[in-house]
Amino acid sequence: MKVLGIETSGLVGNIAVCDGNTVVGKKTYGKGFSHGKEIVSSIESIFDEIRWEPNDIDLIAVSIGPGSYTGLRIAVTCAKTLAYGLGKPVIDVPTLDVLVENVKDNNAKTICPVIDAKRKSVYACIYDRDKNRKITDYLIISPDNLIDMLPETTLIFGDGIAPYKQIFAQKELTILSDEKLGIADAADVARLGMERYEQGIRCEINSLIPLYLRKSEAEERLMESR
């Protein structure tokens, strides 16, 4: 199956095209890139390089968050537009699931990717590696409350660790500080999307929305003013 993976949930964005589990084309952008301007041109560039036509794609997989409001909104809109235009199926992939792939070679039993959600909170989800399943829902939570939920020796990583390192240091956790582990990979988005699709999971184009977990700052200010 030929899959286009789109990942723009953070400051670093990337697009990948996979043929089965093989990455055949990829574009990555550094901090400060413009999601809106780069995403379409990068897809076109990849197709030119690998000499594929857009219609060769069998499935469009998009990372839906949590993460950057702007990045997620643009990625989802782009995925829906491509799905409509090409008549191809689209599948949503939660970003925290994608991040877990960054530590798939680690032997830790319990894993928790942590994304900085600002305003003294983080996005997180706890996974049981042995049972290959989530222990919790996708969370927006304070670091203090998250640490109370984590079993000792849990492997934690992601850009939500550094801002609250003193809090996470209060417990015997396995902390990986490599910044690269906090960057979701579009190739993993494509692979996970393919797995979900082959498992029979479907996503209607009209129902595809970002996984924000909380309202934007503007929405919260509006509610507070009422």
Pin down the residues of each PLM region.
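Phosphate-handling active-site elements
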Residues: D48-N55, Y84-V93, K109
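Glycine-rich phosphate-binding loop signature in dinucleotide/nucleotide-binding domains
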Residues: I50-N55, D105-N107, M149-P151, Y197
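Surface "functional belts" at beta-alpha junctions
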Residues: T22, S34, P89-G182, Y212, ...
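Gly/Ser/Thr-rich beta-alpha loop segments that engage phosphate groups in nucleotides
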Residues: V12, S34, G65-Y69, R73, ...
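Acyltransferase
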Residues: K134, S177-R226
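N-terminal beta-alpha supersecondary unit
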Residues: M1-I64, I183
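DPxDG-like acidic metal-binding loop motif
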Residues: L59-V90, T95
